């Protein structure tokens, strides 16, 4: 949620350079359409694609298109990537504000990171779910030992990256193509370049990552 978690002021630091040049934006998790509207207003020259498990076509307009996609399904993500490749569609910005489940965050990152343009930005919102306790319900998804072991905050804080939900081929691509990772835990910002500071000691408060491609 772009406005609800006050992300906008933080994103400006990273996205302003793309504001006039961006042509394609993708957001996973549409909810009430407010974030799509924010991207529509901010990136005046960009087409925006929304992906959600529910039909959100009511938010379509001249530059916004919505499609049904379940990010828990590798098959559906693969089909989306295949369609983008067929249409030569790449993105300046991809935002994952979907299920917030750590497995889904990593599966989606592994599949969609290739769709970023050089210097493109990939954002994963609400990684505070990495700290939910075993057995706790995460927006309808149950936290498990495996998810706690490979939570998304720890995943992004370590190199080379290892994930049971991302193929070796995609992990190699990610490790070779990431320029930097920035993690912020409202209201503090942690920018680390190629060195990462673990933030595991901080309480879970809408932790978000900003990942730039080379």
Q: Where do the model's predicted regions map?
A:
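A short alpha-helical cap/connector motif
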Residues: 1-95, 99-124, 128-214
């Amino acid at each position: 949620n772009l406005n609800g978690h006050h992300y906008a002021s933080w994103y400006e630091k990273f996205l302003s350079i793309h504001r006039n040049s961006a042509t394609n934006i993708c957001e996973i998790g549409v909810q009430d359409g407010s974030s799509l509207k924010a991207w529509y207003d901010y990136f005046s020259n960009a087409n925006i694609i929304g992906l959600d498990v529910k039909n959100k076509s009511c938010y379509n307009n001249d530059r916004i298109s919505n499609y049904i996609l379940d990010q828990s399904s590798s098959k559906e993500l693969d089909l989306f990537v295949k369609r983008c490749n067929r249409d030569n569609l790449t993105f300046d910005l991809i935002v994952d504000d979907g299920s917030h489940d750590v497995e889904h965050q990593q599966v989606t990152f592994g599949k969609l990171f290739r769709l970023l343009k050089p210097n493109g930005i990939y954002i994963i919102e609400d990684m505070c779910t990495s700290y939910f306790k075993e057995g706790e319900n995460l927006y309808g998804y149950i936290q498990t030992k495996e998810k706690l072991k490979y939570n998304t905050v720890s995943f992004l804080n370590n190199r080379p990256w290892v994930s049971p939900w991302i193929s070796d081929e995609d992990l190699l691509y990610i490790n070779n193509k990431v320029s930097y990772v920035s993690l912020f835990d409202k209201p503090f910002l942690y920018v680390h370049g190629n060195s990462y500071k673990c933030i595991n000691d901080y309480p879970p408060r809408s932790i978000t990552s900003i990942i730039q491609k080379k």
